[in-house]
Structure formats: C-alpha cells, structure tokens
A protein has these predicted regions:
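Conserved phosphoryl-transfer catalytic core
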Residues: 15
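Short, flexible active-site recognition loops that position polar ligands and cofactors
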Residues: 144-154
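A C-terminal junction/extension of Radical SAM enzymes
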Residues: 155-177
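Conserved AdoMet/S-adenosylmethionine-binding subsite of the radical SAM
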Residues: 1-9, 18-145
C-alpha cells in the first residue's frame, strides 16, 4: 500500500498475461488494494479472460489480422485456432461494457495493406471506436530481427486517411515520424 496515492492503477501485460494461472488472484489482490486494473492481451485464453473481466477497468486487445481469415491469423500468431480464441475474447469484452482499444502491430510482410484495411473494416463493422496501429519496429539493441525494417510508406497515405476516417479514435504509433 506504499504506492497508494502514487499510482492510479496496474496494467497486467507480458508476453500474454492470461497464460499465467495466478492472474485471477493477482488481479483480485490489486483490485482489493483500490487500484484500477488494465490488461494487455491477445485474447488467447477466453476462459481466463471471462473469469477476470468483471475486475478489469480497461483492455488493450491485440488483433493480429482479420479474424475472418483464420488461416492468416494462425500464420501470423504461429498458433492454431488463434482467430477463434480472439473472436471469443472479443465478444466477451464487447458484452462486458469494459472500455477497450483494439490495436495491431503491423508489418507489410505479414499484414499487407489490403489485409490491414480488411481488418479495419471488420473492426468498424463491429463497432470498435478506438484503434491503434502500431508499426513494427526492430527491438532496441537487437543485432538480428526476423523482419526487415518497415519503410515510412507503409501504410500508404491513402490507407492512413481511410483509417483516420473509420475510427473516432485512431492512433498511429511508429518510430519514423
């Protein structure tokens, strides 16, 4: 409780925080201390999310690709059934009324512009009002990265204009601007 008054809340992030079976107890303890609780998740374990959602104040939900394209989604995540797990988690969050943002870390080799726009249209159709586009960047200090650097031309100015028009709250996070 030494931090009370210094902190407004605690955000559970990771990796993927929902893989930790201790997460529900940790969230309850933080909530019992009077802090707001945020969660960063890709939604890969809907059952654990469902258990803690009543205690969560805000969710940053990572969406990797259009969830309607399960093959692409699974390829981007490297895990089978990840699109269906994401969709289940997305529906749980929507139904809960908890504030959330959807965000995508994008690289043109995995999410070409046409797929990025397909994803954005899906989010729009689902009523998402806050979308953050995070352009992939190499990890700081990394000597090797599995992906080449992303140029400032991704996404195009036209695509950027569409994205800004789709969402009341559109955020672009990148290092080259």
């Amino acid at each position: 409780m030494r931090r009370k008054g210094l902190l407004d809340g605690v955000v559970f992030s990771g990796g993927e925080p929902t893989v930790d079976p201790a997460l529900p107890d940790a969230v309850r303890r933080v909530k019992d201390m009077g802090f707001a609780v945020g969660l960063h998740t890709g939604g890969i374990i809907p059952k654990r999310l469902e258990e803690i959602l009543p205690l969560i104040d805000w969710v940053g939900l990572d969406v990797k690709a259009p969830p309607t394209d399960a093959e692409l989604y699974d390829r981007v995540t490297g895990r089978p059934h990840s699109a269906s797990h994401f969709l289940e988690s997305f529906r749980l969050i929507q139904a809960s009324g908890v504030k959330f943002e959807c965000r995508t870390t994008a690289h043109p080799d995995y999410l070409p512009e046409e797929k990025l726009l397909e994803l954005a249209r899906w989010l729009l159709q689902e009523g998402v009002d806050t979308f953050a586009l995070q352009i992939y960047r190499r990890p700081m200090g990394a000597l090797f990265s599995p992906f080449p650097a992303v140029g400032s031309d991704y996404p195009s100015e036209e695509a950027r204009a569409l994205l800004k028009g789709y969402f009341p709250h559109f955020i672009e996070r990148r290092n080259d601007r």
